UniProtKB/Swiss-Prot annotation:
Gene it is expressed from: TDA11
Family: Belongs to the TDA11 family.
Compartmental location: Cytoplasm
Main location: cytoplasm
InterPro entries in alphabetical order: Tda11
Biased amino acid composition, Basic and acidic residues: 290-301, 403-421
Disruption phenotype: Leads to cell death when overexpressing the camptothecin mimetic TOP1-T(722)A mutant.
Residues that bear Phosphoserine: S244, S286
Name this polypeptide is given: Topoisomerase I damage affected protein 11
Length: 504
């Protein structure tokens, strides 16, 4: 039961009125005493206009708001006190009004009837008012019949409620399907929009990549142009670029003489050329700050040229002088195939020793010029004079004998001087052995003219008592003297070494 049925039952209890079911209609006249037999509800049908069905399935008659008062004689339930009392209605004006009010609140549901029940309905002569309700009718129903009819109507009501539930669920399912279809359509549209956006972005990226490659190519061309303007050596061929500016600043004479040799200066200049080429290549490819780096490199190149060009040129000239002097001394002019004789204790610097080693590798490739021979002789005379002056100053400051590790002077390039060299070595070696001086066995010492004269005067004034000490001192000091051409021998020819002096 729902709330509406509970409300109706509570009102019926308060008013002491039963409006549950009316299955039979009996027409009665108020004057007639002998009443008809009441027909059972099972044999009689019911009129569709007289009934309504609640949601629970029970049949109720429409309740009168203003029931009429009946007399004791006219009351139909006097004979059967156990029967339920039903209100009799006379024709009055208030009945249609009450029915209209009740119908406005309750919408009756029509229960389908079978043809058999319609045929069983008796033809009742009565006068019908509005809404098909008889004006004079009385219904009597026993409690058992009312209960049976209530059960049957409840079953019909339950089946109708199930049908109504099915009818209500079908449209809801339809609404859900339409919503699903709508959401599906929206999702498809979103996917299409996403695909379109992806395609647009791909096209945009391709366009940007093309612009990037084009701008990179333009930038590379501009870099090449700037590098050509800043470094003119890049415009020259690769063969000409292989020569460094250091090698270009060397005099032409020395370059032509060293053309056929894999010489030390060439080996020094090649790494510099390679470094110069690599720096040029890196500068041409450098991505940023090209002008600043070019200016720095140009300034560094100019500083390198100023630092290294002159020393290397002097080194090459000095190398040539030493080479020709050694050739002249060792008589390579006569026999170029002979092995050179190593001089004992020649005082040369690191550059001179490396140059001599380099010259010994390819002696046949050298050529001699008369002008360079004169220059070399003048240079050697100047060097020997400087050495003699330095040794004279040291001996004047110190009275004791100071042995200096010096090397032999360079002799003339004739056979006679070679023979003199061998004889001088033998005499000096014998004197050194007699005097006991081991340092003079392998070393030659220079002597100056002033010291030579002083030693001669001192030796003449010494007595024979000094003996061995005097001879030792004489041999030591005489070994440090230099005798020049044109001076008297003074009986010491074995210790004199002639030094050639020529004017520049």
């Amino acid at each position: 039961m729902n709330k509406f049925d509970e409300f109706i039952e509570s009102n019926e209890k308060d008013l002491d009125v039963d409006t549950s079911t009316r299955n039979s209609i009996i027409s009665m006249s108020p004057v007639r005493k002998t009443g008809r037999k009441i027909r059972s509800a099972s044999s009689n049908g019911y009129r569709l206009e007289h009934h309504r069905t609640s949601s629970a399935g029970s049949m109720h008659s429409q309740r009168l708001m203003t029931p009429t008062r009946l007399n004791d004689q006219d009351h139909p339930l006097q004979a059967k006190p156990d029967a339920r009392r039903v209100v009799t209605r006379h024709s009055s004006v208030s009945v249609p009004n009450a029915m209209s009010k009740r119908r406005s609140l309750i919408q009756p549901m029509v229960v389908p009837t079978t043809p058999e029940s319609q045929n069983n309905l008796p033809s009742v002569s009565h006068s019908e008012g509005s809404y098909g309700i008889p004006l004079e009718s009385t219904t009597v129903l026993s409690s058992e019949q009312a209960m049976a009819s209530g059960l049957r109507r409840s079953r019909n009501g339950s089946s109708q409620s199930v049908n109504s539930m099915i009818a209500t669920t079908i449209p809801t399912n339809g609404v859900d399907v339409s919503a699903l279809l709508q959401s599906l359509a929206t999702k498809e549209l979103e996917l299409l929009e996403c695909k379109q956006k992806i395609e647009d972005l791909k096209k945009q990226t391709q366009h940007e990549e093309q612009n990037y490659t084009r701008r990179a190519r333009e930038l590379h061309e501009l870099k090449e142009q700037v590098s050509k303007h800043l470094d003119p050596s890049l415009n020259t061929p690769v063969k000409n670029r292989a020569f460094s500016p250091v090698y270009q600043n060397i005099p032409l004479e020395s370059r032509t003489e060293n053309a056929g040799n894999s010489s030390l200066p060439s080996s020094v200049s090649k790494p510099k050329n390679m470094g110069h080429q690599s720096t040029n290549q890196s500068r041409s490819v450098s991505p940023q700050d090209i002008q600043e780096r070019r200016q720095r490199d140009d300034s560094s190149d100019s500083s390198k040229q100023s630092l290294w060009s002159k020393p290397l040129a002097l080194f090459n000239q000095f190398d040539k002088i030493i080479q020709h002097e050694i050739e002249r001394t060792l008589n390579w002019d006569d026999s170029l195939s002979g092995t050179p004789e190593v001089q004992e204790g020649t005082p040369t610097s690191n550059s001179e020793s490396s140059a001599q080693q380099y010259d010994n590798e390819a002696p046949g490739a050298r050529q001699k010029s008369p002008s360079q021979g004169s220059v070399s002789r003048s240079l050697w005379s100047f060097v020997s004079d400087v050495k003699a002056g330095l040794l004279g100053i040291e001996e004047e400051n110190d009275n004791d004998v100071i042995t200096d590790n010096r090397c032999d002077p360079v002799y003339k390039s004739d056979r006679q001087h070679e023979q003199k060299k061998s004889t001088h070595k033998i005499t000096n070696r014998g004197q050194a052995e007699d005097s006991g001086d081991d340092s003079s066995l392998n070393m030659r010492k220079f002597k100056t003219t002033t010291k030579f004269q002083k030693d001669n005067a001192g030796n003449n004034s010494l007595t024979d008592e000094s003996g061995h000490r005097t001879r030792e001192k004489k041999s030591k000091r005489s070994s440090n003297k230099l005798s020049f051409i044109g001076e008297p021998d003074n009986d010491n020819s074995s210790v004199k070494n002639s030094v050639e002096m020529t004017d520049f």
